Each structure stands twice: as C-alpha cells, then as structure tokens.
UniProtKB/Swiss-Prot annotation:
Keywords: Activator, ATP-binding, Cytoplasm, DNA-binding, Nucleotide-binding, Phosphoprotein, Transcription, Transcription regulation, Two-component regulatory system. GO terms for molecular function: ATP binding; sequence-specific DNA binding. This is Hydrogenase transcriptional regulatory protein HupR1. The gene is hupR1. Probable member of the two-component regulatory system involved in the regulation of the [NiFe] hydrogenase activity. HupR1 is probably phosphorylated by the sensory component and then acts in conjunction with sigma-54 as a transcriptional activator. GO terms for biological process: phosphorelay signal transduction system; regulation of DNA-templated transcription.
Length: 492
C-alpha cells in the first residue's frame, strides 16, 4: 500500500499566489490552502499538517504573527515564510518569534519551492522518528548509531545549496553563486577560506547538484596528517604493508565517478603534491607498497586556508599543481564578515542541538543575539556551533539568554571597525596605561552584569563595589542594558 502524501498548508491572501504554489506542489503533497491566518488556524485545528508555507505580508495578521501562534500550538510543524522584504528587523522577528525553518524570497521558482517543501517534509518525519528513537535508546542504553541518525545524515548530505543558511544580503551569496556556476562543470575547484568557514559544506553542496550526485562523496583534511598516513588514506595500501596484513582501499578509489574533497591541501608534502598532480592529469594512483597503478575518475575539490599563490612564489607549493587545482577558485568569507547571518545560523544550530540532545529550546533573547552578532568568531562556524551547544547545556529556560554566553565573548566589546578585540589586542593597543585599564574594566563590568542578568546588587557584590559605586562606573563608561537602558532590579 502506497504511503499517503505529506500534507502541506499554503497561506496567502492572494488567490493567484495560492494557485501558483499549489500547481508547483500538488504532485508531491496533499495541498491545503487558506486565504489568511484565521482560515489557516481553522484548518490546523481539523487537519494534521507537516509543513506550512506562509506569505509574510497579509492583511490583519502578518506571516510572522501567524507562525508564532503555530509554533506555540503545533511546534512540530515545519514553518517556511515567503517575503519580498529583506530588512534585518523582519528577519530577526521571524527567527525569534516564529522559529522558521527557511526564508524564500519573491519571486520564487517552482523548483525552489518544491525542493524546500520536500526538505521540510523530510525534516518533519525525521524529527518525529528521532524523538521516538531517543526514548528507545535511553531505555536500551545503546551507543550504536541509530537508523534515524543514518537517515538524517543521508538527508543532509543529499541536499544541495539549500543547506547553506544565509540571509538574502549575506556575504556568502557571491561564493554560492560561483559554486552554482562551477557545480555542473566537471573541473577541479579550489575553495579558499579560514578553517570552519564552511568549505566542506559548500563542496558537498556542489557534489549533490553536479552530474556525479548519484555517486559517492568523500572528504579528508590533510592538516596535521603525517605524509605516510595521508598517502594511505588517499591512495590505499597493498596487502602486507599495514599491520594485520590487510589491504586498504584509498579514498581516491572509493570516490571513483564521484567527488573527493581534500581540505588543508596547503599541508601536502612535496611527494603528496606530485601524487595529486598525477591523479589529476592521468587519473593514475599507486597504493602504498604497490608497483602497479590503479585508475580513478573523480572530481577533485580542494580547500585551502593559506594563500597558495603566495606559497608558489615562495617555492613551498608546486605551481603546476596550483594551476591544476584552481580551474575554478572560490573565496569563502569568514563568519565575522557574515554578521547578518549569525542569528539565522545560531537558531538553526540550536534547533539541531535540541533534537540531538533531547532538550527543548525555542530560541535566543534579544540580548543574546546582540552579543553573538557582535562577536568576531575567530573559529568561524565551528566556534559558533560549540557556543550554541554549550548555551543549550546550561540553559534552564526555553529561551536562551545572554548570561549563558562564555565570558570571553561577553567581554569582547566591539571595536570601532566592528571587529571584537581580544585581551591581547587591548593590552597592545595604542593609548596610555590608564586608557588600557579602562578598556579592561569596561569589559569586566559588561560581562559581570550580563552574567548576573543585570541585577546590579549581585554584580556590585561580586565586584566588591557598592551599588552607588557601580552606578558611577556605568555612567562614566556609558554602559547600558542591551535593550537601551540600564535595567533596575530589586536587591535579593
């Protein structure tokens, strides 16, 4: 018996927009439509809906207002909003109030709408299965990887550029546009960017929209790998070379007819550089300890954190390999250049972490988002992910506040250029001793107040100050509550 199609609710006050969306989705979904929020609520009270796609601008109640109520009453429903407006205020409201899964901007393409709806339906099913399985795993005390976890990984790996979250005006938009151009051309591509900037995710997205998408995708990071181990991982080893006498198939052969992403290519030894060049030129590889060559037909995407062109000029990287790797070259911006994306990324990471750890969380408060957006994130996406997970672990409420943020982030006051200043930068900055001490004092005051939820009595006691003395320092440095005023709280 065939499974029933997932139910999707389309909400828009314009009949022609509803008709266009229904036409794009009706082959894959059981489509329900509503002309406005009230009609949609009535449908939700009667029907089981997995996905909602809602227009932002509607008379009466906006899409954000409607989806906020949906999150409270039907939190498992995956919510997508369509908007023609890209101002950050609207986006922040949608992220925090409605807990949306994805933005779509007008004009949307039917294939884009269908792809987003399919992904949302899969995520709905996956979340429900994961919740059920988490309960079973606790009872069984099992540490083995679950079937649902495998399916979730396959789902994420199976999606293309839609997995790369960003706002419409993101600095990431240009890199993604270039990646889309190169994806369908079977040429090597070099992704330049700092560690944690999303190079592997972009490489995976390129693979899954390429002509090789039905073939395997493998990745390896050469940074820190000894030459012999890197050679074995990439090209394999003949029987008798490794302990135990077993042969090993390298990633280059496993990725035959698929895609291989090699990060940290700047760390490749001269011998490994030569082997990579040979593989690119002739498709030939030689396993460690072997005499005969094997062949592979793969698409190579590489990632580099260093400037390979400069390394070529210094004689530390082969010029012929650099030019072979960089038929297409894409520069990825660091997270500090994507401040407008931080809230969206953090919300998505929080939702994933909440499901993974079985702990409910609805989002961040305004003060927490302000700190997260103003921090420099030298560790890029990895650091943000770890910080969000840490906040979730210590959270006592469904809405995560700024007091949960690590001290070094709370103390990192933005500089005039917008970048955060580390303690070392403050110590070596221009100015007198008094100026530098004042900078450090401002950071300590700001962090202590935030951690104590702006209770000045507790903050003053912790700092060994009177409330009058604390107030004098706040006035002197112009330190205010993130909401725009210093919040008064009664003493304990």
């Amino acid at each position: 018996m065939a499974a029933s199609a997932p139910a999707i609710l389309l909400v828009d006050d314009e009949p022609h927009s509803l008709a266009a969306m229904k036409l794009a989705l009706e082959d894959d979904f059981d489509v329900l439509t509503a002309q406005g929020a009230e009609a949609a609520i009535a449908i939700l009270e009667e029907e089981w809906v997995q996905v909602i796609i809602c227009d932002q601008r509607m008379p009466g109640r906006t899409g954000v207002d409607f989806l906020t109520e949906v999150r409270e009453r039907w939190p498992e429903t995956v919510r997508i909003i369509i908007t023609g407006y890209t101002d950050s205020a609207s986006m922040m409201a949608a992220i925090n109030d409605a807990g949306i899964h994805q933005f779509l901007t007008k004009p949307w393409h039917p294939e884009q709408l269908l792809s987003s709806a399919r992904n949302a339906a899969r995520m709905f099913t996956l979340a429900r299965e994961n919740e059920r399985l988490s309960l079973e795993m606790r009872l069984l005390n099992s540490t083995s990887e679950s079937r649902v976890e495998k399916r979730r990984r396959a789902l994420r790996e199976g999606m293309g550029f839609e997995t790369i979250l960003r706002t419409p005006n993101s600095a990431m938009t240009g890199a993604i546009a270039l990646a889309r151009q190169f994806a369908s051309f079977d040429v090597p591509v070099l992704l330049r960017g700092e560690p944690g900037s999303g190079r592997a995710q972009l490489a995976r997205a390129m693979h899954y929209v390429s002509l090789r998408s039905d073939k395997p995708f493998y990745e390896i990071n050469l940074a820190g790998l000894p030459e012999d181990l890197a050679m074995i991982e990439l090209f394999g080893a003949r029987r008798g070379v490794l302990p135990g006498g077993v042969a090993k198939i390298g990633l280059a052969q496993k990725a035959d007819r698929g895609t291989l992403f090699v990060a940290g290519v700047e760390a490749a030894s001269p011998a490994l550089q030569l082997a990579l060049l040979r593989m690119l030129a002739d498709g030939a590889i030689t396993p460690l300890g072997g005499q005969e060559t094997a062949s592979t037909n793969l698409r190579l995407i590489t990632g580099a954190a260093a400037d390979l062109r400069a390394m070529v000029a210094e004689g530390r990287f082969r010029a012929d390999l650099y030019y072979a790797l960089s038929a297409g070259e894409i520069a990825l911006p660091p997270l500090r250049a994507r401040r407008g994306d931080v809230a969206l990324l953090a919300q998505s990471m929080l939702a994933e972490a909440a499901v993974r750890h079985g702990k409910q969380a609805l989002g961040f408060d305004a003060a927490a988002l302000e700190f997260l957006e103003n921090y420099d994130w030298p560790g890029n996406l990895r650091e943000l992910h770890n910080e969000v997970t840490r906040m979730l672990i210590f959270a006592q409420d469904n809405v995560l506040g700024a007091e949960l943020i690590s001290r070094h982030i709370l103390q990192a006051a933005p500089s005039e250029s917008g970048a955060d200043r580390s303690a070392e930068e403050v110590m070596t900055a221009d100015g007198t001793l008094k100026d530098r001490i004042e900078l450090i004092e401002m950071r300590i005051l700001r962090e202590t107040l935030t951690r104590n939820r702006w209770n000045k009595s507790r903050a003053a006691a912790e700092l060994g100050l009177s409330r009058v003395g604390l107030r004098a320092k706040l006035d002197r440095y112009g330190i205010e509550h993130p909401a725009g005023r210093v919040q008064e709280e009664e003493e304990d």
